[in-house]
Amino acid sequence: MQPALRNQQSAGTIDELRALNARFIHNFVTSDVASHDAILHPCFINIWPTGQRWDRATYLKYWATAFDPDVIVYWDVRDELITVVGDVALVRSTNKHTRRRDGNEVTGMTMYTDTYLFENGAWKCIQAQLTAVAPEHYPADDTIVSVYIAGKLQARAK
């Protein structure tokens, strides 16, 4: 007998995953390793745009110091798309980032797909995969979900 699958696209499930996505990003910007560790599956793997794979321990070590607000002066989340199929969820978004190096600012975008598994009553991220985005495929500003400037979450206009 198969276990019953969750209501795939219920508003509650989507809201829960949207909140996890916001927490995932906030954990990165604030270097909150403990909070981030709590949402990762024990078998978590990270896949970089280069194809390099990092296990959970390597990823969390990197996570502790990866965001420097003096270098990453702008960060946003945009074009969020969440799909749920049974006990698996794909959380996709794009980050726009502006990095300051040697007095120059360089802006780019990276798309990510975080794969969540619903297990033991909770969603846990089992894989995060990053993909560089070519300028001709940049999502529009009207899809922005959240903005961080110098590591501080900005209030959204209503």
Task: Give, region by region, the residue ranges found by the protein language model.
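A beta-strand edge to alpha-helix "cap/lid" segment located at domain peripheries
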Residues: 1-38, 45-158
